[in-house]
């Protein structure tokens, strides 16, 4: 095993081997066979799971790295107009979240039995390993570069908002109104539709005979932007500390020679 699946730091540091690299740069031509189907959705995420981390894609209720309680999410960035004078690092660099981050399918029959204190979503997704890559038009998937990779968990303040959002969504299920759920209801945690079409992807709900569109818990795109900013600030700090460490060592050597 190239990393310790029980150790968060080991998982994070192994993931960060892809930072500023593409899969082709990391593997060479070894994985060409995995990218033949150009229309397959989620291909990059699947290859990261199966080839890079070495576990099979699944829909388990547990986190991807269950022994470390970490869920993996591979997500795209998009290029935006650079704003050099912006106070936001992501705007200075010219990147933004391309889409929401989908967390898990909502099982209306099961979620109606839950409370916030015992909810299955946070058991699975309390801490995320986020791997953001820059999505570029006409660039092969294996050549897309990873720009941000790190562990992330919501702050206490954000968690309060997420709890409120969760209750808004789940209360509609408990009231037999799952078909009325809308992403506009909430701030950070959303409930996006999932499936080929809303009509074909319907699920039963416990307190109504009306079938509701299949939905998934997700982190809303605007909130993902704030997560990206947080990770960029942390990355900036990491680089500063590394530079500071190297600078201090150079000074030590210089003084020793003096």
What is the predicted function of each stretch?
Residues 1-65, 74-258:
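Nucleic-acid endonuclease domains
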Residues 70:
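Conserved active-site neighborhood of enzyme catalytic/cofactor-binding cores
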């Amino acid at each position: 095993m190239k990393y310790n699946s029980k150790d968060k730091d080991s998982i994070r540091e192994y993931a960060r081997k892809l930072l500023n690299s593409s899969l082709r740069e990391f593997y060479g031509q070894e994985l060409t066979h995995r990218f033949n189907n150009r229309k397959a959705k989620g291909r990059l995420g699947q290859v990261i799971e199966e080839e890079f981390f070495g576990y099979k894609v699944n829909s388990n209720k547990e986190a991807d790295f269950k022994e470390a309680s970490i869920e993996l999410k591979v997500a795209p960035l998009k290029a935006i107009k650079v704003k050099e004078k912006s106070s936001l690092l992501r705007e200075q660099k010219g990147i933004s979240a391309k889409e929401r981050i989908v967390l898990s399918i909502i099982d209306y029959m099961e979620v109606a039995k839950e409370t916030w204190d015992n909810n299955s979503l946070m058991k699975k997704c309390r801490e995320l390993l986020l791997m953001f890559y820059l999505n570029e038009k006409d660039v092969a998937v294996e050549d897309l570069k990873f720009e941000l990779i790190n562990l992330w968990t919501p702050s206490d303040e954000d968690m309060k908002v997420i709890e409120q959002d969760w209750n808004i969504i789940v209360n509609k299920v408990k009231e037999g109104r799952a078909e009325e759920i809308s992403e506009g209801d909430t701030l950070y945690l959303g409930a996006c539709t999932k499936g080929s079409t809303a009509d074909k992807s319907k699920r039963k709900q416990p307190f109504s005979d009306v079938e509701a569109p299949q939905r998934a818990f997700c982190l809303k795109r605007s909130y993902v932007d704030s997560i990206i900013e947080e990770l960029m600030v942390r990355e900036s700090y990491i680089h500063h500390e590394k530079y500071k460490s190297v600078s201090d060592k150079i000074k030590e050597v210089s003084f020793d020679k003096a």
